[in-house]
């Protein structure tokens, strides 16, 4: 019987390594795909490990710039903070991984793709809905969800099948990391009353270990895109990495969040997003300077919906594409420089300037240079307050009657 091909999203960890053997037992030839999203792993080792475990082919694809420009950028421009806190670190990478799975599957003539998600997380939804949107004819296999093994049973299977067991398997934490940040769950973090131990963090310093002097950075934007740090031009991926180091040193971007998952449960996770939180803060301030009031007041409504769509795995939905078009239109004049102070866990904007600034000092000032027409206020107040005045007059007459 001829074997079918399946493309597996491969991380190098125990679950996806065991999945290679498990899929082989199901009569599949496994093609492993590992993406470099900026997490800092030795992905050359991961690529070779997939082959040693039994994959017939192994891909390692550097998608850092694509992830930065096509995914993280939109999240920054939409100020996506799920439930006001979470910058969508993992949720942003899933549609890109799904896209690459589909591309390799079509290239290799595979009939299926596979992922290593469990049956109780958000990621299974994000992967599978994205894959269905891109190629509804591909079969999607979720080995970890199907085999329902305990950790002990999985380790026993790995030993029986000569699957290398990671040396850090005894770590209590489940970690996911990319350019946009780092998420951490499980272990002691499952107790929402327990303080996260310092070993749960990697990208940021504890406040007591951060410098006692602030550091200032100037972030340059062109049409909503961060392009420079302190006057030096960077690609977007490199700018994010550089800012992660700068802001992380000052403890910026630590987030402890009990969130409502798509699958109906609450989970407690710890995030580190130094660059993401700094860029979102700076970008919002530049928009405040360059957007007219109507756009400034309406855009948060769109931002909330975009955030929900991305979190819920609907990156490739028609609504998200339509809202993205609105978002892009709002960025045309978001050009300028924002000065940010990094200090003791905070990214504080202390200055902003733009050639498209709608702030007119001569209209805003209370000094002798004031050019605002104060006499116009009388007529404006009369017309603006007219509906309220008429309503009050009508009801006053009814009371008197």
UniProtKB/Swiss-Prot annotation:
Keywords: Amino-acid biosynthesis, Arginine biosynthesis, ATP-binding, Cytoplasm, Ligase, Nucleotide-binding
Binding site for ATP: 9-17, 116
Species for this entry: Bacillus cereus (strain G9842)
Known pathway: Amino-acid biosynthesis; L-arginine biosynthesis; L-arginine from L-ornithine and carbamoyl phosphate: step 2/3
Assembly behavior: Homotetramer.
Source organism, top-level taxon: Bacteria
Record Pfam families: Arginosuc_syn_C, Arginosuc_synth
Family designation: Belongs to the argininosuccinate synthase family. Type 1 subfamily.
Entry EC no(s): 6.3.4.5
Upper taxonomic lineage: Bacteria, Bacillati, Bacillota, Bacilli, Bacillales
Protein name (Swiss-Prot/TrEMBL): Argininosuccinate synthase
Gene Ontology biological process terms from the UniProt entry: argininosuccinate metabolic process; L-arginine biosynthetic process; urea cycle
Catalysis: reaction(s): L-citrulline + L-aspartate + ATP = 2-(N(omega)-L-arginino)succinate + AMP + diphosphate + H(+)
Localization: Cytoplasm
């Amino acid at each position: 019987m001829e074997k079918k091909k399946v493309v597996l999203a491969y991380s190098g960890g125990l679950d996806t390594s065991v999945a290679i053997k498990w899929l082989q037992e199901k009569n599949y030839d496994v093609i492993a795909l590992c993406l470099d999203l900026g997490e800092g792993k030795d992905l050359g080792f991961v690529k070779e490990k997939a082959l040693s475990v039994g994959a017939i082919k192994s891909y390692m694809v550097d998608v850092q710039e694509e992830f930065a420009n096509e995914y993280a950028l939109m999240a920054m421009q939409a100020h996506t903070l799920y439930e006001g806190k979470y910058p969508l670190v993992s949720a942003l990478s899933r549609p890109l991984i799904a896209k690459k799975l589909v591309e390799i599957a079509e290239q290799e003539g595979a009939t299926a793709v596979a992922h290593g998600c469990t049956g109780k997380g958000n990621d299974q939804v994000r992967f599978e809905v994205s894959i269905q949107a891109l190629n509804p004819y591909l079969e999607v296999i979720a080995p970890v969800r199907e085999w329902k093994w305990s950790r002990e049973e999985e380790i026993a299977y790995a030993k029986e099948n000569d699957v290398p067991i990671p040396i850090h398997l005894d770590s209590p934490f489940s970690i996911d990391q990319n350019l946009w940040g780092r998420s951490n769950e499980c272990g002691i973090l499952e107790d929402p009353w327990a303080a996260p131990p310092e070993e749960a963090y990697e990208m940021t310093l504890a406040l007591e270990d951060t410098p006692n002097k602030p550091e200032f950075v100037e972030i340059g934007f062109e049409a909503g895109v961060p392009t420079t740090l302190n006057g030096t031009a960077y690609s977007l991926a490199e700018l994010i990495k550089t800012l992660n180091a700068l802001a992380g040193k000052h403890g910026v971007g630590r987030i402890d969040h009990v969130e409502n998952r798509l699958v109906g449960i609450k989970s407690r996770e710890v995030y580190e997003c130094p660059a993401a939180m700094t860029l979102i803060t700076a970008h919002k301030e530049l928009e405040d300077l360059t957007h007219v009031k109507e756009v400034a007041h309406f855009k948060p409504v769109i931002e909330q919906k975009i955030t929900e769509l991305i979190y819920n795995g609907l990156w490739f939905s028609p609504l998200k594409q339509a809202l993205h078009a609105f978002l892009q239109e709002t960025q045309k004049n978001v050009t300028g420089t924002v000065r940010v102070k990094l200090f003791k866990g905070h990214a504080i904007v202390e200055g902003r300037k733009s050639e498209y600034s709608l702030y007119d000092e001569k209209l805003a000032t209370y000094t002798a240079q004031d050019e605002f027409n104060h006499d116009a206020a009388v007529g404006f107040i009369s017309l603006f307050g007219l509906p309220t005045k008429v309503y009050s007059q009508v009801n006053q007459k009814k009371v008197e009657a």
